[in-house]
Amino acid sequence: AESMLKYGTDKPDLRNPLIIHDLTEYFSTVEFKPFKGRPVRGIVVPNCAGQSKGWYEKMLAFAMDIGMKGLGYITVQEDGSYKGPIDKFLSPEKKEELRTMLDLKTDDTLFFICDNIRIVNDLAGQIRTELGRRLDLIDKDRFDLCFITDFPMFERDDDGKLIFTHNPFSMPQGEMDALLHQEPTEIKAYQYDIVCNGVELSSGAVRNHR
């Protein structure tokens, strides 16, 4: 869950310094209809406010190509004010709350990603990767490895049916007690992946042997 929220993927490239933030609760008190009642993610990009209009248009085009309906953003000006399509929907109090919460600084750009819960993290992850590529933020001479653990055992498909997320033969954490008493989508499996620079090198699991 942490990897999906922070990086938008379970195969994160940790050379990319950009982090995804969950802004759903923040926007629950903002009167902006496209975000109302839906999960919202944000990505802060330092020293990006000076990019050209054409650069932002290319990012919007990329967002549309991957299935998004748009790509909102605000930039932080020298006087501390915000500029961008969403700025007018934020009260002075909400602007200050956002600044404090994300430690926004002059020349930062904050991108907003909003969609349904099943795909919003994936979309945010693709935007994060594209920003890293376009801004040349990824150190190609580095190897960053990580273990991804605590995979959810089940998820629901578009029809609400329970399906396995990965290996159905893995042991659930909590074993039979978890299967009998926990909400299925909250059960975690004894599974892991080894990831390097966004590539899965290997995976493993404790088999359901008892």
Map each language-model feature to its residues.
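Class II aminoacyl-tRNA synthetase catalytic cores and aaRS-like
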Residues: 1-210
